[in-house]
Swiss-Prot record:
Gene Ontology terms describing biological process: microtubule-dependent intracellular transport of viral material towards nucleus; symbiont entry into host cell; viral penetration into host nucleus
Encoding gene, per UniProt annotation: L2
Primary location group: virion
Top-level taxon of the source organism: Viruses
Species assigned in the record: Human papillomavirus 15
Cellular component per GO, a single term: host cell endosome
Protein name, as recorded: Minor capsid protein L2
Disulfide bonds, paired cysteine numbers: C19-C25
InterPro entries: Late_L2
Amino acid sequence: MARARRVKRASVTDIYRGCKQAGTCPPDVLNKVEQTTIADKILKYGSAAVFFGGLGIGTGRGSGGATGYVPLGEGPGVRVGGTPTIVRPGVTPELIGPADVIPIDTVTPIDPAAPSIVTITDSSAVDLLPELETIAEIHPVPTDNVDIDTPVVTGGRDSSAILEVADPSPPVRTRVSRTQYHNPSFQIITESTPLSGESALADHVIVFEGSGGQNIGGSRSAALDAAQESFEMQTWPSRYSFEIQEGTPPRSSTPVQRAVQSLSSLRRALYNRRLTEQVAVTDPLFLGRPSRLVQFQFDNPTFEEEVTQTFERDVEAFEEPPDRQFLDVVRLGRPTYSETPQGYVRVSRLGRRATIRTRSGAQVGAQVHFYRDLSTIDSEALEMQLLGEHSGDSTIVQAPMESSFIDINIDEPDSLHVGLQDSTEADDIDYNSADLLLEDNIEDFSGSHLVFGNTRRSTTTYTVPRFESPRNTGFYIQDVHGYNVAYPESRDTTEIILPQSDTPTVVINFEEAGGDYYLHPSLKTRKRKRKYL
C-alpha cells in the first residue's frame, strides 16, 4: 500500500490572502494577521499610559537607568561609574567701551589771491648763525569766479597736513560701443577693383622693374633729394589666409557600450585563430554574389544572398570551385559588418568546410572566416567660390612695356623754365595748368562690333563696317528685327540731283470696279431720321 504524501499546510498569511476577498476568513486567522488579539490590545492600550523607556531594562549594562539606583529610605541615587561634575566659579565678562574719538582740526582755506609770506620765528636755542629773514612772495594769476574746493586734513597735531585738491574740471569719460546684428535675408557684397600701388586687395601682385618706363619731372633741387626718404614696405596678411577646421564626424550612431557588448560574442567566433581559419578575399563578387565563388550555378535575380547558404555536394563527385579559397565549403553564413582598428569597414562571412566525411555520413571540417575590407570613401570636395569675384585678383605690371610714371608739380614751376616766359609769376606760366593731365589720344571705333544682350541669354553681335557712299548718312541693317546703326560720314562731294518731269500728275479715283463715270457728291441723297410723335 502506497503511503500518502504529506502535503504542507498553508501558512496564515496565504490563508488570509485567499479568504479576505471572499470574506470567509476564520476568526483566529483574521485576529492574528490584523493584530487584534487580546495580548495585542493590552500592549496597545497599556503603552499609551505607561512609559518604561530610559530605564535600561533588558540592556545588560546595570546602570539603573537615567537616575541610577536609589536605596530605600535614602535620598537621590548615585549613578554607577559616573564622572563627578566639577563646579567652577563664573567668569565676569569685561566691558568694552567705545574707542577714543580723535578730534579733527579744521584748517581755514587759503585765498589764492592773497600773497603767501612765511616768517621764521625765534627758537629757544642759541643760534650761532646770524638771524635770517626769508620772504617768499607768490604772484598768482588773477582769476574771476573760480570754484575752490575746501581741503580735507586728516590726522592729529603731530601729523603733517595733507592737502587734497580736486581738479575743478575733470575730464569727461566717454565710451563708444558698436553692435552689429547679422541678417541672413539681407547681404551686401562690397568689392572694389584693385589697383597696384593703391590698395593691396589682390593676392598676387607682381611688379617687374627694369630699364623701361618714363620718369618726367623729379626733384627741384639737391636739397629736396636729400629730404626724400625711403620707406620699407610691410607685408600685410592675405584676406584669404585662413584655415577651415572641420570637426571629425562620428563614425557610428550606436553607443560604444552597446556596440562592444553586441560584438563581443561575434569577435570570439570570428577571430579565434585556434578554432577559425582566417581567409582574406579580394574578389568583389564576395560582396554581392558569394555563391558564384563556391560553385558554378545560374544567377537568380530575385534571390538575395543576404542569408545563410548551404551547398550540397555529391560524395563521389569532385567539383572544383571557381575560387580555390572556397574549396569544400558547404555552409556560408550571412554577412556581418564591423570596423577594423584602422577605421575601415569589414564585411565578414562565417563558413564551414566539409573536408572529411565518415561512413556514417557525418562531415568533419574547420570553420573559416572570410572577410574583405572596403576602401576609404573620401568626402565630397566642394569648390569654394569667392563672393563678388572680379578680374583684378592678379595684377602684373611690366615696366618696360606697360608702366609710365609721370611726376609733374602743377603748383610750382620748374626752375629751368622760369624766365623763358613773358611773366615769371606762377599763375601766368603754362605749366601751372590742369590741361597737362588731359589725354591727347584719339580713339577710332571703325570696324568695331556691337553686342546686345546679357550674360544669361544669348548675345547678338552686329558688325559695323566702314564703306564709302555718295550720301551723307548711310544705314546698314543686318537683321529686320534688330537695331538700326547709323554711321554718319561727311565728304566734299557734289550732290547729285535726279531729273524730274514738269508735267503734273492727274489722279482719277474709281469707287466701283469697272465704272466709267464720277458721281458728284451733291447728287447723293442723304437719309434723314424721322421723328415720331
